[in-house]
């Protein structure tokens, strides 16, 4: 299962299509990767 927007992740492949794993301090979450 992939992680949806703002879901926790450790790498880009954890996230659903068009989402990438972002690191903000100690928090890692899936955010839009800019693709359609």
UniProtKB/Swiss-Prot annotation:
DNA damage keyword on record: no
Residue numbers bearing the Phenylalanine amide modification: 36
Tissues expressing this chain: Expressed by the venom gland.
Keyword Nucleus: no
Principal location listed in the UniProt entry: secreted
InterPro entries on file: Huwentoxin-1
Disulfide pattern: 2-16, 9-21, 15-30
Coiled-coil boundaries: none
A Gene Ontology cellular-component term: extracellular region
Single GO MF annotation: toxin activity
Location within or outside the cell: Secreted
Function of the molecule: Neurotoxin that selectively increases Nav1.8/SCN10A peak current (EC(50)=894 nM) and causes a large hyperpolarising shift in both the voltage-dependence of activation and steady-state fast inactivation. Acts by binding to the domain II S3-S4 extracellular loop of the channel. In vivo, causes spontaneous pain behaviors (that gradually subsides over 30 minutes) when intraplantarly injected into mice.
Protein family according to the UniProt entry: Belongs to the neurotoxin 10 (Hwtx-1) family. 62 (Vatx) subfamily.
Additional record remark: Negative results: has no inhibitory activity on the late current size of Kv2.1/KCNB1 potassium channel but does slow its kinetics of activation. Also shows minimal activity at TRPV1.
Domain description: The presence of a 'disulfide through disulfide knot' structurally defines this protein as a knottin.
Name recorded for this polypeptide: Beta-theraphotoxin-Eo1a
Organism: Encyocratella olivacea
């Amino acid at each position: 299962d992939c992680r949806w927007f703002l879901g926790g992740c450790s790498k880009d492949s954890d996230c659903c299509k068009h989402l990438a794993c972002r690191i903000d301090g100690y928090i890692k979450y899936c955010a839009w990767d800019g693709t359609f």
